[in-house]
Amino acid sequence: LSKADRLQRAAANLPVEKRLRTIEEMGRIWRRRWESGELDGVAERLAQSTGYSPEVIRLEMSFVAEVLDPEKMMKNLESTLRGGAASLEGMVPISDGENIRNHPCGPALVISSGNSLVPPFIPTITALATGNLTILKPSLSNYEAVLAVISTLEEAVKTTGAQEMLDLLVVSYFSHRSEVLDHLLTNARIGVVNYWGGDPGRGEVSAKVAMNPHMPRYFVNGPLTGFAVIDENSADEEAARGLAMNILLYDQQLCSSPTQAAFIGSMEAAKRFCAMVGSELDALGKGMAMGMSDDGAFILQCSRKYVQFAGGRVFSSNDTDNMWTITLSESVSDLDEASQSYGPLAFHNRRRFLEVIRVDDNERVIDLIGDLPDNNAYRGADKVQTIGLAVSAARKEALMPSLPSTGAYRIVPLEDMFMRSPLEPYDGMDMAKLFTYGVYQRDTSLGKEVLD
């Protein structure tokens, strides 16, 4: 940290094109290692440590190259930074006689989530591309895989000559009670802290950051969830398959994963659609074995019974490698009542578990999305991040004026809930802005006109 200013000044003189070329080379190296089988052992151990199926981990390992896509990063920088990517290199005109330059506000400390590999690199690559000295704290479960990605940077700079980027990155594992981590949060000269996760961790980190005399920025990517909206006219096999795939990916641990859905139409049509989704979960889930202990299977069966006692209809599978569950209720969430009676039914304990609520109109859909944080069955999720739509054009037009007011951050096609565009904010925030600050420069005087 004592060298942070010098290192960030050196990186500030590195052309953005060279920074992105280095990131591109990282992606090329990763892709080569992955396709050659060099990373098979890392993938196997990551599956064991995270509990995800080998098939899901293999998919995630292939996603790493997407995070290292220079064209996507350039689009993100151009669309989010005032003055565009060029403002990271020098002053850029924004009006006659007025200029702006975006500087890194680091050193940056990224405390990442531990349930997969890709999330740690979303803020880390952005922080590096914007010139921040970056300290990345992965979790014990993904530490080895994170180091495997970082090793591509070590090789990439030999080709691009961008040693400054390698000098900016530090990867360290700290326990939650680490004295070093405590020092970083409470006393170190840190410019920004990015925490991924929920309570109690984020509250503890927030309290410590508030004590830091250097007043670092603090922003959180908290636990969120997905909500699907389907109407009777769009309840076809394509919608069922898209919904099933988003349920299976990462066993609903993504912030975009659908955990609740509203079906607008008759109860009979809702039953048919739930059965269709179940068939797709059977077919697709066979290739993504989840695995479940006897204790876990017993708890899940009890959970299903409690939902039935609360009045819900249950569609389910008893295949221990693919134990999916769909509940269907009328107008209100039966899971709300059931989860109050049965603790193990809590939000973070559910995997491949979707609650479908049949409703009559658009207004009820809006209410369900906005009320989800107050539903006992979803305690642990701050709110809805992603709304996935499979509705008619007319219904979409009717819904769109109200959907943004629900607090959700993303409204996308149902089958595409897990995919991100480089142009979209991350949980409502432009991440490149969070790792930079704007320096404004003006050549002309404005005060004379006011004082005269």
Predicted feature locations:
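N-terminal Rossmann-like NAD(P)+-binding subdomain of aldehyde/semialdehyde dehydrogenases
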Residues: 1-100, 384
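Core active-site phosphate/anionic-ligand binding loop and the adjoining beta-turn-alpha structural block
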Residues: 62-66, 73-74, 78, 82, ...
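Rossmann-like NAD(P) dinucleotide-binding subdomain of oxidoreductase/dehydrogenase enzymes
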Residues: 88-249
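Short internal beta-strands
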Residues: 135-141, 262, 388-390
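Short active-site oxyanion
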Residues: 190-193, 352-354, 383-386
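Structural motif
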Residues: 195-199, 231-233, 264-266, 329-330, ...
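NAD(P)-dependent aldehyde/semialdehyde dehydrogenase
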Residues: 241, 250-258, 262-381, 397, ...
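Structural signal for terminal/edge beta-strands and the immediately following C-terminal loop/tail
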Residues: 425-452
